[in-house]
């Protein structure tokens, strides 16, 4: 299963950027209160709806330099960090670019060195620690198969939401072209 990830935050940043889905522009949401930094490029999988009501989150492992906010990367999942925060389910799909042969050996979560998994776990366990009202309440790793199932389920939630939006707006899935018809 391949998908596009929109990068919001490059690896090494303490700034938390978010795409404003209405304008398409990138907004600085906040600077992390802790001294931690993002362990991989971080963003979301396009055309998905996660359990938290936002697009499904993704971390992209790269062999070279970090990318930049707004960069689109074609990826495949190798696993997922199932996480619950103060607002509920907040899963993070761990993926690699489909175009990088240096990462071809990473096919499932167990192919990633355990220290790399621990580094990612540590980040998500502490990155909200100093923020009032925010917390991480539980998390565990699952493999590629579970990650791909969640990507598919999130795509279905996204499609259902947009079908409901079309019905409520009277469009019924049709796009008006303008003018007298």
For each feature predicted by the language model, list its residue ranges.
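Hydrophobic N-terminal alpha-helices or hydrophobic patches in metabolic proteins across all domains
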Residues: 1-165, 170-180
């Amino acid at each position: 299963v391949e998908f596009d990830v929109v990068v919001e935050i490059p690896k090494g940043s303490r700034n938390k950027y978010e795409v404003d889905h209405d304008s398409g522009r990138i907004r600085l949401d906040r600077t992390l209160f802790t001294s931690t930094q993002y362990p991989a490029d971080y963003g979301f999988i396009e055309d998905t709806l996660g359990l938290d009501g936002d697009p499904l989150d993704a971390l992209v492992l790269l062999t070279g330099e970090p990318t930049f906010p707004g960069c689109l990367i074609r990826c495949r999942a190798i696993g997922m960090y199932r996480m619950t925060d103060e607002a509920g389910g907040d899963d993070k799909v761990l993926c690699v670019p489909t175009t990088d042969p240096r990462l071809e050996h990473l096919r499932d979560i167990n192919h990633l060195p355990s220290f790399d998994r621990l580094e990612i776990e540590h980040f998500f366990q502490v990155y909200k620690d100093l923020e009032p009202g925010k917390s991480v309440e539980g998390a565990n790793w699952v493999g590629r198969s579970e990650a791909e199932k969640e990507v598919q389920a999130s795509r279905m939630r996204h499609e259902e939401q947009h079908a409901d939006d079309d019905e409520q707006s009277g469009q019924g899935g049709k796009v008006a072209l303008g003018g007298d018809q």
